[in-house]
């Protein structure tokens, strides 16, 4: 009988409660509320390692992150502007698209690779893994003191931008901006539309 490998050492009770409280305070923070510095490459890597712990049926790892450094923002801004021009957007919108490449002190792209021909791992499970990886990354950044937000928009479906970040079997899922929060967290209050947690009650025959 094969021995069961030991699991990770549990956190002390007080530390565990502190971590749960900290995670419960996370919320999305847009670029105008972010200040420098953004995450270092080491911080991004630590967050990506946490993202890798997402539930991953089949061990496909259907996502990766691409960091856009400060030196690459100008090139990205030209791609954004060119895409807006090709969509026939007016000059003001073209300049706004160009400026979005400079959003946030830290910027990363989330690239997804979904394989439709894996019999035991349907597409929706792979997308769930991508989303879980994103959430793990955001949580890890939060624990390290960064605020962050995932952003989409027309740029993620722009063919030239996709080609710059993705292989032919990949798609650009979203952008992630990160930095230090400019102000204390004020999570948005959500009106419950359905119970968040409930107990299943089987229907009687």
In which residue ranges do the predicted regions lie?
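A glycine-rich helix N-cap at a beta->alpha junction
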Residues: 98-100, 164-190
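Small-aliphatic-rich amphipathic alpha-helix that forms the alpha element of a beta-alpha
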Residues: 51, 108, 114-163
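Short secondary-structure junction motifs
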Residues: 60-63, 143, 173
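Phosphate/diphosphate-binding glycine-rich loops and adjacent basic-rich segments that engage nucleotide
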Residues: 186-205
